[in-house]
Amino acid sequence: MFVRVVDFVSRPGKTRSLNEIIQSRLFPIFRVQPGFVDEIVLESDVEPNRVVALSFWNTREQAERYNQETYPTVKEVLAASLEADPVVRTFNVVNSTTLT
């Protein structure tokens, strides 16, 4: 399994709006992507404008395909709520309670 970790900084006062957009407009896009497994969105308890999204994919190739073909549209949808460009990092899942 493969994970994309996307770190967002919302515009001041836009964190709730950002989370609502992710849930209402982006979750449906994620669900139809080949290899998509799950999306978890975290809101910082100490930095009010920070949101981190973890998307889980069956393979690195499927995540990369999403990154090339769909992610540019996702960034456009979120642009009005963001203070800066999101930072994307990728990881291999090496341990998980759901995989054992």
Positions of PLM-derived features:
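Glycine-rich beta-strand-turn "strand-cap" elements at beta-sheet edges
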Residues: 2, 9, 40-49, 72-100
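A short, mixed-charge helix-start or loop-turn motif at secondary-structure junctions
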Residues: 8-9, 56
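Short, surface-exposed ligand-recognition loops at beta-strand->loop->(often short) alpha-helix junctions
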Residues: 9-22
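Short, charged/polar surface micro-motifs in flexible loops or helix N-caps
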Residues: 12, 47-48, 58-63
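Intrinsically disordered, low-complexity segments enriched in polar/charged residues with Gly/Pro
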Residues: 14-16, 27-29, 41-44, 65
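An amphipathic, aromatic/His-enriched active-site/gating alpha helix that lines ligand/cofactor pockets
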Residues: 24, 29-37, 56-89
